[in-house]
Amino acid sequence: MAKIMIQGTASSVGKSLIVAALCRIFKQDGYSVCPFKSQNMSLNSYITLDGKEMGRAQVLQAYAAGLEPEVYMNPILLKPTSDKKSQIIVNGKVYGNSTAMEYHNLKIKFKGMLKEQFKKLEEDFDIVVMEGAGSPAEINLRDRDIVNMGMAEIVDAPVLLVGDIDKGGVFASLAGTMLLLNEGEKERVKGTIINKFRGDVEILNPGLDMLEDIIHIPCLGVVPYTRLQLEDEDGAVEFNKKAYAPIDIAVIKMPHISNFTDLDALKSEEDVSIRFITSKEEFKEPDLLVIPGSKNTIEDLLYLRKCGLEESIKEYSKDGKIIGICGGYQVLGSKIKDPYKVETDLGEIEGLNLLDMETTFEKEKITTRVSAKLINEEIENIVYGYEIHMGISEYSENVKPLFKIYDKNGEKVDYFDGAINEKGNVMGTYIHGVFDGIVFREKIINELRVKKGLKKKKSQVYEHMREKELDKLADIVRQSLDMEKIYSIIGMK
């Protein structure tokens, strides 16, 4: 089996999409290929068919490889709960909560597990495309590294180093990274990639020659800056700004926002623009307000109260349409109870009182794939998604359920999810990915169109659009990189 590892000079240099592109290229060339990231830190996660939790970046990479996402592609997921603590997910299940130092001490324990996981991939695939995290030059973490050079050493993988020229300083970041690697690590780096380039590459070439003279490693290509409608799992998410879009969707960007990939399908609608708001001054008059998921719902509710957004949301709820997802659904209720102090020591807190319901946080996390249908709609109107939450919500007779769940992890079930007020303009659900399918997305957006005097439209199938975008990404990267050299590095062709 062949393997290649993509590492970067820093976070957000484009490692994830380079891995996705290589997965699609190798697949197009007839190889069975699998993505692998030993440890990911993200608040955007996904639930597999067997009810296990993994990072969203490896989900996109799995689709690029033509695979159903599985947790062996991302054995360890860290979900920050505060500046100093994270929830640790190992092989799709909650391992526990720990501080950075506690987790640093746990890494030795996980090395053997990661090695065994990778052995299974060697048996099943022609090529594994690995992804590092942050930078391999974090010299204070070197002795227990399990995600960059430490992981490359465990499986003896060659490395390509990616630098982001769009931020500036790409030559210094590449040369500086190489300077901080030890001799064994330097030998693993077989090439560099310049990512997110704008302009004429001829102007860049002299710098590439000088860089190669300094670090003695060839540049394998320059990838142009390209806007693609593919999800971004990084915290500083930026949605494509459209020159004009009649449907304005505002999203509350809370400090602990999670699973904002729920919004990706919405931004695929041509007449929809999405903007994040962090203050009441930015609120304005949106056509739809979305309150997304949160890794710390109580802290984010306190944030809404402190910054004045609570008042804006309540005023908007008189005539505007509001959708809350997971944590955003919980804050819409009358009360959140935390008897086991899962999130804070407060015990309980008053909600926004826009839905007559109460949420209680339990000890165990619910992670499940679900299929549902809108209440009072035809059975064909199916919504697919997944749940990731520790809260159980109970509502009064003043609110109605939004969905009926009929399938849970492949088993037939019959229970309700979500809630909608009597007026029908404030609603919430635990289902992540609720907009990915056509049914609910088209229904909501068409209601907004009609309200503004616009014609109804058919929504495109998000999965089809994603496939086209992945092919486009692969074409761009194939044209930009020396693929013959990359095949030579991994010992193929």
Swiss-Prot record:
<keyword id="KW-0169">Cobalamin biosynthesis</keyword>
<dbReference type="GO" id="GO:0015420">
    <property type="term" value="F:ABC-type vitamin B12 transporter activity"/>
</dbReference>
<dbReference type="Pfam" id="PF07685">
    <property type="entry name" value="GATase_3"/>
</dbReference>
<keyword id="KW-0315">Glutamine amidotransferase</keyword>
<dbReference type="InterPro" id="IPR033949">
    <property type="entry name" value="CobQ_GATase1"/>
</dbReference>
<comment type="pathway">
    <text>Cofactor biosynthesis; adenosylcobalamin biosynthesis.</text>
</comment>
<dbReference type="InterPro" id="IPR004459">
    <property type="entry name" value="CobQ_synth"/>
</dbReference>
<comment type="similarity">
    <text>Belongs to the CobB/CobQ family. CobQ subfamily.</text>
</comment>
<feature type="active site">
    <location>
        <position position="432"/>
    </location>
</feature>
<comment type="function">
    <text>Catalyzes amidations at positions B, D, E, and G on adenosylcobyrinic A,C-diamide. NH(2) groups are provided by glutamine, and one molecule of ATP is hydrogenolyzed for each amidation.</text>
</comment>
<dbReference type="GO" id="GO:0009236">
    <property type="term" value="P:cobalamin biosynthetic process"/>
</dbReference>
<feature type="domain" description="GATase cobBQ-type">
    <location>
        <begin position="246"/>
        <end position="440"/>
    </location>
</feature>
<dbReference type="InterPro" id="IPR027417">
    <property type="entry name" value="P-loop_NTPase"/>
</dbReference>
<dbReference type="InterPro" id="IPR047045">
    <property type="entry name" value="CobQ_N"/>
</dbReference>
<dbReference type="InterPro" id="IPR011698">
    <property type="entry name" value="GATase_3"/>
</dbReference>
<dbReference type="GO" id="GO:0003824">
    <property type="term" value="F:catalytic activity"/>
</dbReference>
<dbReference type="Pfam" id="PF01656">
    <property type="entry name" value="CbiA"/>
</dbReference>
<protein>
    <recommendedName>
        <fullName>Cobyric acid synthase</fullName>
    </recommendedName>
</protein>
<dbReference type="InterPro" id="IPR002586">
    <property type="entry name" value="CobQ/CobB/MinD/ParA_Nub-bd_dom"/>
</dbReference>
<feature type="active site" description="Nucleophile">
    <location>
        <position position="326"/>
    </location>
</feature>
<dbReference type="InterPro" id="IPR029062">
    <property type="entry name" value="Class_I_gatase-like"/>
</dbReference>
